[in-house]
Structures are given as structure tokens and as C-alpha cells.
């Protein structure tokens, strides 16, 4: 029976475990604690931290592939596992684009993908340049580690924003500023890609955020024109191919009031 190791024992790993049963596969999970959602149901649990290379090695031993229910695994550890012959999917060279928003924006810019204007923020003085380039207010983001609304600031008071920038840079948090998009709603285009380059997509969904967290998913997205839906799916498949993704990936999108699609973020894991 094929064994797939999933790093992380959260709700996404638990749902993946349920799906694996129907496929005749065993999902092994690396969980930090036996109380985590997937650890409560999986028959194959390795306890340890996703930041611990030895724990990752133990979880990967004998597995046909290693994947994730979150993107927080250090890519340097994954590169070591790759060199040791572990099939890390998606590979760390792709995963970095979901971990680091600056890396993502630069690469998507090279690909010509629709996205907001952005600027790296490396000092408080960069706020002035960003304001001239992006307009005001702009969206300040932590380039790494932010999720579910965390690490995102929209502040109209310049002094308050300067304080946030100084505080975050003082904590060694890399920052970027993005143009504030006037969007109608948020969409998500979910795709899967095989090691051989075959791709498939799910219907585009609408996501509703409350307090920065995804609260409701409507599938398929209501009143989405067929051509816009097809464009979102093709965009997601093209990004997956260009980045070398193997596995599943969600492209989180803004639909503007004029019907344009703007890439917000990438998630290289099962996505709810």
C-alpha cells in the first residue's frame, strides 16, 4: 500500500487522510502532538517538529512521497531530504513561492501574471517611496509567516505605519508593500499537477473572509462568467507549470469591480 507522508497534523491533514483511504493509500502524518486533528485518526503518526530535520527524516523513511498541510517547513531541510532521495512534492524550489511573498511577486512579475504593484520595505524611509509608487493607503505585509490575516496591515496614519515598520524590521521580519486593490470578491482557483506535467482544475470557488480567516467557501463561485472562470483555471495551471509544482496548489485571486483577476497569494497544499 503506498505511503504518503504529510508534514503537519492539522485539519487539512485530517481531511487528506480521509481522502487517502478511498485511494487505497496510507497517510502518515508528522504531528507535534497526539491531540492534533490528523493524529487523532491516522494509524501512522510520527511525533516531532516540522523544524527538526531528524523528525522530517523519520517521517519520510519508507514513504513514496512527502508533502505538506502547511508551508512552514524550512526549505533548507527539504533540500537535504531531496538530496537523500526523498520525493518532496511540491519541491522546495516551488514551495518557496508560497513561503516568501517577495520571491512570489518577483517570479509572477517575470511570468506576466496579473498582480498588484509592490515594493520591498527595508527601512522606514522606504514608506515614502512606496507611497509615491503604490498610492495611499497601501497594504503592508510580512513577506514570510503571515496567514489568516496575520502579518497584514492597512494603516492610513503615516506615523502609525512608520512605527509598525520599525517594530517589524527590528524583529527581522521581511516586509513588502502592495498596491491596495479595489476588489469585488475573493476567488480561489485550485489545480493539481502530476510529476509528468499533467494538470487538472477544480471549479473556481468564492471565499468569504471574516476577521482575516476563511469562513465560507461557495462552490462554484456564483455568477462567475464562464470565460472568467476558464481564465482563472488556465492562469493557475500556467503558474503551477512555470513554478514546477507537483501536487495541489490554490491561486488566491481578487476579482475587481471591472471583472479583472489579480493574483493575491499562492497556497501549495490542500486548501479549504
Kindly label every feature range from the protein language model.
Residues 1-103, 110, 125:
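ATP-binding N-terminal substructure of ATP-dependent carboxylate-amine bond-forming enzymes
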Residues 58-59, 107, 129-130, 164-167:
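CheY-like receiver
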Residues 90-152, 158:
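A conserved helix-loop-beta module that forms one wall/lid of the active-site cleft
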Residues 267-272:
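Glycine-rich phosphate/pyrophosphate-binding beta-alpha loops
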Residues 151, 155-251, 255-257:
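Internal nucleotide-binding/catalytic subdomain
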Residues 259-261:
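Conserved protein kinase catalytic/activation segment
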Residues 28, 67, 88-89, 116, ...:
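Structural detector of well-ordered beta-strand residues that form the stable sheet scaffold
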Amino acid at each position: 500500500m503506498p505511503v504518503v507522508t504529510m508534514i503537519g497534523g492539522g485539519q487539512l491533514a485530517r481531511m487528506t487522510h480521509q481522502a487517502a483511504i478511498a485511494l487505497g493509500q496510507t497517510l502518515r502524518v508528522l504531528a507535534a502532538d497526539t491531540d492534533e486533528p490528523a493524529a487523532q485518526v491516522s494509524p501512522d503518526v510520527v511525533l516531532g517538529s516540522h523544524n527538526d530535520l531528524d523528525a522530517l527524516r523519520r517521517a519520510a523513511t519508507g514513504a513514496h512521497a512527502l508533502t505538506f498541510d502547511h508551508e512552514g517547513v524550512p526549505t533548507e531541510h527539504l533540500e537535504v531530504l531531496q538530496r537523500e532521495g526523498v520525493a518532496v512534492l511540491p519541491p522546495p524550489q516551488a514551495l518557496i513561492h508560497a513561503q516568501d511573498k517577495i520571491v512570489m511577486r518577483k517570479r509572477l512579475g517575470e511570468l506576466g501574471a496579473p498582480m498588484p504593484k509592490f515594493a520591498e520595505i527595508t527601512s522606514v524611509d522606504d514608506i515614502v517611496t512606496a507611497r509615491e509608487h503604490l498610492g495611499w493607503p497601501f497594504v503592508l505585509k510580512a513577506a514570510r509567516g503571515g496567514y489568516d490575516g496575520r502579518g497584514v496591515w492597512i494603516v492610513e496614519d503615516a506615523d502609525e505605519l512608520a512605527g509598525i515598520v520599525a517594530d517589524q524590521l527590528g524583529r527581522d521580519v521581511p516586509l513588502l508593500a502592495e498596491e491596495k486593490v479595489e476588489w469585488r470578491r475573493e476567488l480561489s482557483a485550485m489545480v493539481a499537477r502530476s510529476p509528468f506535467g499533467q494538470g487538472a482544475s477544480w471549479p473556481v470557488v468564492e471565499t468569504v473572509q471574516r476577521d482575516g480567516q476563511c469562513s465560507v467557501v461557495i462552490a462554484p463561485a456564483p455568477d462567475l462568467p464562464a470565460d472568467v472562470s476558464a481564465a482563472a483555471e488556465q492562469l493557475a495551471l500556467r503558474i503551477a507549470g512555470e513554478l514546477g509544482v507537483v501536487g495541489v496548489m490554490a491561486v488566491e485571486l481578487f476579482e475587481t469591480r471591472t471583472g479583472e483577476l489579480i493574483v493575491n497569494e499562492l497556497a501549495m497544499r490542500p486548501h479549504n
